Structure formats: C-alpha cells, structure tokens
Amino acid sequence: MFVRIVKMSFKEDKINDFINNFNYNKVKIRNTQGCKLLELYRDKTNPTIFFTYSYWDTELDLENYRNSQLFKNVWNITKLLFKDKPEAWSVDKVYNL
C-alpha cells in the first residue's frame, strides 16, 4: 500500500466549485478498486491550497483510476479551476506511531 498526495491551488472564486465537485464524486472515488482512504485537507494559512491524501493498494490500482472515465470527468472540471499547476507525489509510509 502507498499514499498519493496531490497539492492543488485554486482561484479564489472557484473554491466552492471545487468543493462541490469533490463532494459529488468523493464516494465514487473512494469506492474505486484499490482505494482504501480518501481525505481532503485545506491549508491553514492559504485557503486556496488543498491537498488530497489517498491510500492505494497498488500502483496499478491508481493507474486504472487515472485512466477511468470517473477520473477524466472529475479532472476535466477540476483543471479549469486551478490557479497554479498541481503537484503530486506517490510515497511509502515509513512510520506510523
């Protein structure tokens, strides 16, 4: 299992659009094969910055999601709302205390 972290910065007037789109699709994303957890975070000092944390069984599961119609639908809306280019990392958890 690994963690996918995505940092996204949105135009101020598009934040509600992003949140509405996320809320509409979050259960579908979470129910994607291999997705074990989906969380959305908002930066405390810059409210235009959000992070998603998702836990995936395998890289193939994530790739299958990224090639799915669901991802394409979500991303086609989301990418129009960005202020800056998103950043993404796939990481392995080293410690959990």
What are these regions (language model features)?
Residues 31, 64-67, 80:
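Secondary-structure boundary motif
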